[in-house]
Amino acid sequence: MPKVITLPGDGIGPEVTAAAVQVLREVAPDVTVEEHAIGGGAYDAHGEPFPTSTRDALKEADAVLLGTVGGAHDSAWNQLPRHLRPESGLLALRKALGCYANLRPVRVQPGLEHLSPLKAELARGVDILIVRELLGGIYFDQDRKIEGDTAYNTMRYTTSEVERVAKVAFWAAEQRKGRVTSVDKANVLEVSELWRRDVQALRDRDYRSIHLNHEYVDSVAMLIVADPSRYDVILTENLFGDILSDLAAVIPGSLGLMPSASLGDGAGLFEPIHGSAPDIAGQGVANPAAAIMSVGMLLRHGLERSEAANQVDRAVALALREQPTRDLGGSADTQTFTRAVLKALGSSPSVG
């Protein structure tokens, strides 16, 4: 049986993860779910934010479902040495899983166009998947230093790094509309010249059915808000992807509607992109939609169960229309929204 490791974490993480697990059990009752610790709570219990017991459990996982990590700015956790802070546990988790491709869907749900800061006619029907390279580029290269009044970082990519993340983008496009926009700055950066060359060569060799075009990152930063429907799958490197994915995250109108997946050669990591929201933790009012949509991504990309993933996506869309949560202008709390999703899936609306 497939095994999913859950890491509820801190703040509202346990609440939204519990909701997500109920949905997972409904659509995939054969999956074994096992909970482990991460983040600030893990430090309190084990003396480290990414305990050995959690690290060992990942070896048997088919997928990992993460809640949220971290506390308030003035929390005692933030006074710890950096390597013991909750966020260090998250970085160690991603490194342990070897996740090199981050998938960030940007979808405006039908009937919720009014939440977007864009005009309704621009927001309507937006459905973008941003595929970001996660382990290379300027963030990870060790050729970096501050020397007096001079500092430098190095952006470096190899063909193998480019190809492995491009394969994820092309594979995703095959499940969608068959269009990939590769984003670079090849007019001024040699590393982007390599990126463009290798992405094009891979497409021409193995993915000839995919329509590929190349755009500069500054152009995409403008067009993703001026004409977002022009995009299907966006593929880009680490730095550009970090910026573009956060820019695009405002389009749906709430971080509570933003799931994500990080994929590598082993178990994938699936998580909502919102923070731990310690100000509302324990009140039962957190929006679990992103965590539940992360289950949809887990089913699709982690367990290869596309039909179950589609069922979750449809149920969430219906629940958002019928029982919007407080951050979306409605009144539903965590349990009420979860009941609505389970009802849409044909389940008993009972929620513990």
Swiss-Prot record:
Amino acids binding Mg(2+): D218, D242, D246
PROSITE patterns reported for this sequence: IDH_IMDH
The reaction(s) this protein catalyses: (2R,3S)-3-isopropylmalate + NAD(+) = 4-methyl-2-oxopentanoate + CO2 + NADH
GO terms assigned for molecular function: 3-isopropylmalate dehydrogenase activity; magnesium ion binding; NAD binding
Subcellular location: Cytoplasm
Cofactor note: Binds 1 Mg(2+) or Mn(2+) ion per subunit.
UniProt-listed GO biological process terms: L-leucine biosynthetic process
Chief location category: cytoplasm
SUPFAM superfamilies in the record: Isocitrate/Isopropylmalate dehydrogenase-like
Record's GO cellular component terms: cytosol
Binding positions for NAD(+) per the UniProt entry: 71-87, 275-287
Entry binding sites for substrate: R94, R104, R132, D218
Domain of life assignment: Bacteria
Gene3D superfamilies hit by this protein: Isopropylmalate Dehydrogenase
Record keyword Cell membrane present: no
Keywords: Amino-acid biosynthesis, Branched-chain amino acid biosynthesis, Cytoplasm, Leucine biosynthesis, Magnesium, Manganese, Metal-binding, NAD, Oxidoreductase
Residues at the site labelled Important for catalysis: Y139, K185
Catalytic activity, EC: 1.1.1.85
Keyword check for NAD: yes
Stated family: Belongs to the isocitrate and isopropylmalate dehydrogenases family. LeuB type 1 subfamily.
Binding partners and assembly: Homodimer.
Summary of the function given for this chain in its UniProt record: Catalyzes the oxidation of 3-carboxy-2-hydroxy-4-methylpentanoate (3-isopropylmalate) to 3-carboxy-4-methyl-2-oxopentanoate. The product decarboxylates to 4-methyl-2 oxopentanoate.
NCBIfam families associated with the record: leuB (TIGR00169)
HAMAP family for the chain: LeuB_type1
Name the UniProt record assigns to this protein: 3-isopropylmalate dehydrogenase
Organism, scientific name: Deinococcus radiodurans (strain ATCC 13939 / DSM 20539 / JCM 16871 / CCUG 27074 / LMG 4051 / NBRC 15346 / NCIMB 9279 / VKM B-1422 / R1)
Gene from which the chain derives: leuB
